[in-house]
Amino acid sequence: MREVISVHVGQAGVQIGNACWELYCLEHGIGPDGFPTENSEVHKNNSYLNDGFGTFFSETGQGKFVPRSIYVDLEPNVIDQVRTGPYKDLFHPEQMVTGKEDASNNYARGHYTVGKEMIDSVLERIRRMADNCSGLQGFLVFHSFGGGTGSGLGALLLERLNMEYGKKSNLQFSVYPAPQVSTSVVEPYNSVLTTHATLDNSDCTFMVDNEACYDICRRNLDIERPTYENLNRLIAQVVSSITASLRFAGSLNVDLNEFQTNLVPYPRIHFPLVTYSPIVSAAKAFHESNSVQEITNQCFEPYNQMVKCDPRTGRYMATCLLYRGDVIPRDVQAAVTSIKSRRTIQFVDWCPTGFKIGICYEPPQHVPGSGIAKVNRAVCMLSNTTSIAEAWSRLDHKFDLMYSKRAFVHWYVGEGMEEGEFSEAREDLAALERDYEEVGQDSMDNEMYEADEEY
């Protein structure tokens, strides 16, 4: 069995976790109490081991299924909602780790003071869970860049996981600060510091920003004032599509290592852009054909992206198309050929093929009350493109505005952090921007050279 352990850190991580496990349970026919429902695959197969979902659930002697996940937060409020909510019986009490005081939106508190006191007990729970795995494949870490716990404790956890489980895959799902919408003033500080700290400890980071998700909910789902629950259920559909090939059988399955192999050309350039299609409300669903060609085309439209940036200005290095539901390889081939023939979608010249395809035959599951209509096929596109550097430069600019006046820095230094870490982190992000520039530049230079030769 190739097990995967999910770790949900801080408020964003925990709330996305709730939406993900709610969806996984629906997909696999597991009730909120952890026991299989009547139409569950367990009854069809007589054994969960025949099926891929043992990668995400472990089975107890009583026939109950327990998620392979850990919830971590420095304050108890958000996790208490899970402890008393509809899925309270799904999780083992030991899977919930809470502290007594929060990180106050301060990376240094999450990383150096409050978080440091808690990290060993978190790792002990992870160790116990890893011991129950026969062939641990890796970790999925869910957190936000902007909060204190998500950024500080998230970075510390990834550091320690890398030390103790260096050979295992480490994938992050991170809520990135939105361009206009902000949840705290010091978001740029926390984000730059956590990116610097995790750059060498994460194999692949899938980013989503709240503003892009708000826009998708408003435009595609006709939800006038989207709540975090709407956003999280949308993100859960994306996470489910990425992990579907680990949990279900399919003709072209993709495992954790394959994501890195196909999407990350250089170790530091590991931030794929995520796009999902179709996202339609129930009212619109009957009027759209959602053919393979159509949903593939929608993935290349900026308005379906989970991070605000313009892919038409950059170049694609690698693209992973993960289809699920009623999809046949021939249709996918036709869709990809038509995409390649477009002049607007440009690939770097050192990666001419550029497409990795995954097909999982399990259709997307509809969550009641999510606003997303039930569809018979969907696609999630993960693309490593140079245009995501736009997001980094936006973040760096906000950081510079505050740091030039040393605003709020004393709160971080007061928690035992060196002021030099700010400039070190900022330099690292400047280097990251340059890395993206160079990768795109190589192609530009070659093109100019070829044009000169033709002339």
Curated annotation (Swiss-Prot):
Molecular-function annotations in GO: GTP binding; hydrolase activity; metal ion binding; structural constituent of cytoskeleton
Residues binding Mg(2+), per UniProt: 75
Subcellular localization, as worded in the UniProt entry: Cytoplasm, Cytoskeleton
Transferase is among the record's keywords: no
Main subcellular location of this protein, as a coarse class: cytoplasm
Site (Involved in polymerization): 455
InterPro entries linked to this entry: Alpha_tubulin, Tub_FtsZ_C, Tubulin, Tubulin/FtsZ-like_C, Tubulin/FtsZ_2-layer-sand-dom, Tubulin/FtsZ_GTPase_sf, Tubulin_C, Tubulin_CS
Keywords from the UniProt entry: Cytoplasm, Cytoskeleton, GTP-binding, Hydrolase, Magnesium, Metal-binding, Microtubule, Nucleotide-binding
Pfam families to which the protein is assigned, alphabetical: Tubulin (PF00091), Tubulin_C (PF03953)
Binding site for GTP: 11, 75, 144, 148-149, 183, 210, 232
Record has GTP-binding as a keyword: yes
The organism's place on the tree of life at top rank: Eukaryota
Catalytic activity: GTP + H2O = GDP + phosphate + H(+)
GO cellular component terms given for this protein: astral microtubule; cytoplasm; microtubule; nucleus; spindle
Cofactor annotation: Mg(2+)
CDD domains in alphabetical order: alpha_tubulin
Gene Ontology biological process: microtubule cytoskeleton organization; mitotic cell cycle; nuclear division; nuclear migration by microtubule mediated pushing forces
EC number(s) per entry: 3.6.5.-
Active-site residues from the entry: 258
Quaternary structure note: Dimer of alpha and beta chains. A typical microtubule is a hollow water-filled tube with an outer diameter of 25 nm and an inner diameter of 15 nM. Alpha-beta heterodimers associate head-to-tail to form protofilaments running lengthwise along the microtubule wall with the beta-tubulin subunit facing the microtubule plus end conferring a structural polarity. Microtubules usually have 13 protofilaments but different protofilament numbers can be found in some organisms and specialized cells.
Function of the protein: Tubulin is the major constituent of microtubules, a cylinder consisting of laterally associated linear protofilaments composed of alpha- and beta-tubulin heterodimers. Microtubules grow by the addition of GTP-tubulin dimers to the microtubule end, where a stabilizing cap forms. Below the cap, tubulin dimers are in GDP-bound state, owing to GTPase activity of alpha-tubulin.
UniProt family annotation: Belongs to the tubulin family.
The protein's name in its UniProt record: Tubulin alpha-1 chain
